[in-house]
Amino acid sequence: MKDQIIYKRSIHQHLKTLLATVVLTGLALCSKAQLNPFQNMYFQNQYMYNPAMAGLDKVLNLNLNYRQQWSNFPGAPKTGSLTADFQPADKVGVGLNVTDDQSGLIRSTRVMATYAYHLPLSDQTEQLSFGVSLGVNDSRVNYDAINGDVTDQEIAKYNQLKAYADGDFGVAYTSDKLYIGGALPNLKAAFFKNSDSRFDADRLLFITSASYKISLEGTGQGFVLAPLAAFRVVKGYKDIVDAGANFTMNDYGLYLQGIYHSNESMGLGFGLDQTNYAFSFNYNLETGQIRNYTGGAFELGIKFKLFQKSYNKQ
């Protein structure tokens, strides 16, 4: 009887060690993935990170994005995003920004409502925009993903944490060629560091980016090249620099893009951009040591541009 008890304890200890190894490896993959956001936010949908870009155009923009680690590793991260924005009145933009992220056993949902004001400058194509988002952020353990004791007290304690209010602030300068923008996301984490005890790794604290559209005259095909540079401050991680370019073929409604991230990863993508809709596919590949453990991540995006005729009649 005593030998059976010792044997069971030994098995239990080995299982705990194995589980810890799996969790730590999963956290490494999830952490790395969270450092590489949706690639569409750099060119096609800046509202994803900057509330100042809500309602910039007189059309209802509806964007759906899905991102998943190209790996069969249990708990590999996957993220879904929905944004909707439009301009209900002159100089005013509103939007809705929803993100659902699953990393390992943790599932986080963020729902934000946005108000933006667009101030016209001397040139009709120039605007200075300000935006603020307010909403809720909720993180919880996904019981369906647990292969073990679901009655563990630590799991129960984590899920007892309530959803909390959060906010973002952004500013942007835009013209027909130049974009310069910056945002302070996750304001609660930035200004109330001790107000929440839940685990929050790799939270974005600040981001700024700039891009400039260069028309390639003489091609006769409406080719436009837009170089981009961005800078990100991430909690618990070294600052990240992003550099890339977007090449648009307007006459064909196609674009190609590539972005390098200083955290040893690169994103490549292409898309179809038509009058009423757009589609994109992006692939993020790791260039550092973690490339041996993951096949990178893929991202799918679809955009609908609604009620354009209604706006044009006004």
Name each model feature, range by range:
Residues 2-19:
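Bacterial N-terminal signal peptides that target proteins for export
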Residues 34-314:
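Subset of outer-membrane beta-barrel
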Residues 20-21, 31:
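Cleavable N-terminal signal peptides
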